[in-house]
Amino acid sequence: MVKKTFFTTLAAVSFSAALETALFFSGCGSSLWTTKAHANSVFSSLMQQQGFADIVSQVKPAVVSVQVKSNKKKKEWFFSDFFSTPGFDQLPDQHPLKKFFQDFYNRDKPSNKSLQRSHRLRPIAFGSGFFISSDGYIVTNNHVISDGTSYAVVLDDGTELNAKLIGTDPRTDLAVLKVNEKRKFSYVDFGDDSKLRVGDWVVAIGNPFGLGGTVTAGIVSARGRDIGTGVYDDFIQIDAAVNRGNSGGPTFDLNGKVVGVNTAIFSPSGGNVGIAFAIPAATAKQVVQQLIEKGLVQRGWLGVQIQPVTKEISDSIGLKEAKGALITDPLKGPAAKAGIKAGDVIISVNGEKINDVRDLAKRIANMSPGETVTLGVWKSGKEENIKVKLDSMPEDENMKDGSKYSNEHGNSDETLEDYGLIVAPSDDGVGLVVTDVDPDSDAADKGIRPGDVIVTVNNKSVKKVSDITDTIKNAQKLGRKAILLQVRTNDQNRFVALPIFKK
């Protein structure tokens, strides 16, 4: 049986929906191998740690439960949905855990009359948040409030207050609410997450499964995690127990400073397995400040589609290191206006080297529209400095301007036998259409499929097979180990490095 492992955001849509995950009970043991001197120092340090009560008492009043109301139809409640998860159905009827969850079910379960009027119900989603100012600004996750029409927060003392949505930033999954009350609220400050080390203690506070004010502790497991949610991924991984409903809640260091905003977990079941992810404080602080001041986040925009530079790609273009960001498609934007083209590699921004595509995206996003930057660009085998005036990032980044082609080409097919490709001229004369691929070839391994269009080879336009073979010969003379194909698939550009076949 194959287990499905997935990332999930942590907002709980009603208490029953949040519990549609399996409960598992197990025990484990482990051994710590170390020298005596080191062990003594570690245990001595642990003995000095008197728990987290002092920190919790300091910061907990600033943490809130976020309730989101929506006009969407509420999911009907079924006892079988609620309790038939693996593990739960095996518990005795009098088991305290089963009784505990049954109490919650019965507490929130609507009556028969209200079920008959289900179209008038307004479902509630639960999440977490925290005050960052005495005048009522609250940070939470965008996915917590994204479907809402009205919002409320429950304070640590149980007081419920209405809140107003100030702004959201889906790209970083952050949002800001505001409570307008003539009182001062307890609040917390953002800390310096750059000082956070793997192995440092952290404390998470939130509203898992609607259980407000829940405190858990753990350590920093890793930094700079990319979990595939977007180009701005740069998560702090922690092993503190984090579950659905913890979304938007804070992660604190031992100084009581917010070092992260909990947003996702990695789990085979949907519940906590000790792998949670928090947005770094540095990112949250910058985004939140703009949301409060402007109601939105304005980012610098180059107007390019990019892909990673692999070792094979760097070899094919004569780049010493497999670093930077390869331009697959310059959209109609600032970069194209400055002369940046597909196949160019951005290797630095204002003199600072770029490691990868995420590095470039973050640096440009942290700049302001209208700002002029100097890009180090690897173009046609040499480095050039190009100045680009950034624009504002549009709402739709998926702008496409691809060539059209057909897979019907009669008898005009030509063969690149050494590379396992059969190609034909495209209908619009731009590139060569791949009509067949040898499944055992390097091209197939690199994901080239029939219907793809080879637009350029080593940044030179191709219209016939001889354009490719001539480029290969020139690359061999230069001692290159691979050729770089610009391939268009369904109007999306990418670059593929193919090893040069030596006869």
Swiss-Prot record:
Q: Which UniProt keywords apply?
A: Hydrolase, Periplasm, Protease, Repeat, Serine protease, Signal, Stress response
Question: Which one GO biological process term can you cite for this protein?
Answer: proteolysis
Q: Where in the cell is it found?
A: Periplasm
- A Pfam family (short name) is PDZ_6
The record's catalysed reaction(s) read: Acts on substrates that are at least partially unfolded. The cleavage site P1 residue is normally between a pair of hydrophobic residues, such as Val-|-Val
The residues the record assigns to binding substrate are G245, N246, S247, L302, G303, V304, Q305, I306
Q: PDZ domain: from which residue to which, for each copy?
A: 286-357, 419-466
Q: What is its EC number?
A: 3.4.21.107
Query: PANTHER family given for it?
Result: SERINE PROTEASE FAMILY S1C HTRA-RELATED, SERINE PROTEASE HTRA2, MITOCHONDRIAL
NCBIfam families hit by this protein: degP_htrA_DO
Q: Which family does it belong to?
A: Belongs to the peptidase S1C family.
The free-text function statement in the UniProt record for this protein reads:
Could be efficient in the degradation of transiently denatured and unfolded proteins which accumulate in the periplasm following stress conditions.
Report the protein name in the record: Probable periplasmic serine endoprotease DegP-like
Organism name? Bartonella henselae (strain ATCC 49882 / DSM 28221 / CCUG 30454 / Houston 1) (Rochalimaea henselae)
State the organism's lineage. Answer: Bacteria, Pseudomonadati, Pseudomonadota, Alphaproteobacteria, Hyphomicrobiales
Q: What gene name does this entry carry? A: htrA
